[in-house]
Design a protein with these regions (language model features):
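Residue-level recognition of tetratricopeptide repeat
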Residues: 25-26, 60, 100, 134
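Start-of-helix register in tetratricopeptide repeats
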Residues: 18-19, 53, 93, 127
Length: 156
């Protein structure tokens, strides 16, 4: 018989930023009635304001609440640190999320450039190419839109 589930520690009782990140994801995934993932992410960011994972997931929380400018700040922090030592980061999710936050603010030219960077990462190629196709179509570049949507489909 499996072990019964254990309650998440309170944010202030977590020892590491990794614990805060993982408990926050758990609370977010299972929509706990009394715990809030933001509390875990913010405690982690209080301890380490440069943590890529925490900046990205907290930005995602703000994105879901339509605080696009607020989300942009956290995604930028995640991107900045992820390319501190290498122009090609391990994970391109912060780039993709930054692109979304820019697009939703009407900063479509900048979003386009950021989505182009996001397609360098394997897991964000399909959604990144899709977003490029949408922006191409919106500006009447239909040949490019078709090319990008086909690339998106190929990478599904």
């Amino acid at each position: 018989m499996p072990e019964p589930a254990k309650a998440a520690l309170l944010p202030e009782d977590c020892e590491t930023t990794e614990d805060l990140f993982l408990y926050g994801l758990h609370v977010e995934q299972y929509r706990h009635a009394t715990y809030h993932p933001e509390d875990y992410y913010l405690e982690g960011l209080r301890r380490d304001p440069t943590d890529i994972r925490l900046n990205n997931v907290y930005g995602r929380c703000l994105l879901k609440k339509c605080d696009f400018a607020g989300a942009e700040k956290y995604f930028r922090k995640a991107v900045e640190k992820s390319i501190r030592s290498n122009p090609n980061p391990y994970d391109y999710e912060p780039y993709y999320n930054l692109g979304l936050s820019l697009k939703y603010q009407g900063k479509e030219k900048e979003a386009y450039d950021v989505f182009y960077k996001a397609i360098w990462g394997g897991s964000f190629q399909a959604p990144g190419f899709y977003e490029l196709a949408c922006l191409d179509a919106k500006t009447g570049r239909f040949a490019e839109a078709l090319e990008h949507v086909n690339e998106s489909i190929l990478r599904q």
